[in-house]
């Protein structure tokens, strides 16, 4: 990473007011991985892996819009191979990561990389434009913020905040009274503790997106009950990436 981007990343961390006392030594050193950079390799693989989880179907084509230092160094630092490895479901320490481009081609997945400017975002940011096996299009915007840590900021244009450090439930639902309360009650009744919850809506009475980070995984039965709540249109489940 160039000195310019290192300085820029330091300033961004300060702006985010990250509590350095809560960042451990392994967050600083980064995870076990294949490749030269925790931000450009491990973080990139995690971004791709979460995007695959969001789609939750075979992906037949993906375009990576690369911003900032991703745009400048994606070949030399292996970001291209790491992103594709994530789309294939690989973890940062998977030895097959180096061959991910060839593996994707063999599996019939069309891959394209487009350097671009995504505006006022973190320098290690990528937008993934994906098409699944049913020809449904998906967009995921995320950043690798250092030490292998990541943030997903948008899914299909909806604002979210996903770190991948905890199991996460995302609901896309109608903005009607009682929906959030009913979902929260399901967590309470099943003794599932909520670590963090965020809710955004496009406008009053229209579409809303809720992101809930929880302390434990949820069963398929609970997910089915959430899907059955009046007004819920889609439920996305992201299990913790943990060390991977």
Language-model-detected regions and their locations in the chain:
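Short, Lys/Arg-enriched N-terminal segments with co-localized hydrophobic residues
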Residues: 3-19, 242
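Acidic-glycine-rich active-site phosphate/pyrophosphate-binding loop
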Residues: 14-25, 56-60
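Conserved phosphate/anionic-ligand binding catalytic regions in large, soluble enzymes, centered on
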Residues: 30-48
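Beta-strand segments within the central parallel beta-sheet cores of soluble alpha/beta enzyme folds
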Residues: 59-68
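A structural-propensity feature for long, helix-poor, extended segments
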Residues: 67-102, 106
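Short glycine/threonine-rich loop-to-helix capping motif typified by GTGT followed
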Residues: 73-79, 123, 209-213
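C-terminal edge-of-domain segments
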Residues: 105, 110-138
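A conserved regulatory-domain signal marking ACT and ACT-like small-molecule sensing domains
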Residues: 113-116, 140-244
């Amino acid at each position: 990473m160039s000195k310019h981007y290192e300085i820029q990343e330091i300033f961004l961390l300060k702006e985010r007011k990250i509590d350095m006392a809560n960042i451990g030594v392994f967050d600083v050193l980064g995870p076990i991985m294949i490749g030269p950079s925790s931000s450009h390799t491990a973080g990139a693989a995690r971004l791709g892996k979460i995007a695959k989880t969001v789609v939750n179907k075979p992906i037949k084509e993906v375009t990576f819009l690369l911003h900032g230092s991703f745009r400048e160094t994606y070949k030399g630092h292996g970001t291209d191979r790491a992103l594709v490895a994530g789309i294939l479901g690989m973890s940062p320490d998977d030895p097959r990561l180096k061959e991910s481009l060839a593996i994707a081609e063999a599996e019939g997945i069309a891959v394209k990389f487009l350097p671009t400017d995504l505006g006022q975002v973190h320098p290690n940011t990528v937008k993934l434009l994906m098409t699944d096996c049913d020809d449904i299009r998906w967009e995921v915007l995320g950043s690798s913020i250092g030490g292998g840590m990541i943030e997903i900021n948008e899914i299909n244009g909806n604002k979210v905040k996903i770190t991948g450090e905890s199991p996460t439930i995302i609901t896309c639902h109608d903005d009607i009274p009682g929906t959030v309360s009913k979902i929260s009650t399901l967590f309470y009744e099943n003794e599932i503790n909520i670590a963090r919850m965020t809710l955004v809506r496009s406008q009053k009475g229209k579409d809303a997106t809720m992101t809930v980070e929880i302390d434990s995984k949820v069963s398929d039965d609970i997910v089915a009950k959430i899907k059955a709540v009046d007004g819920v249109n889609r439920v996305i489940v992201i299990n913790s990436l943990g060390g991977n």
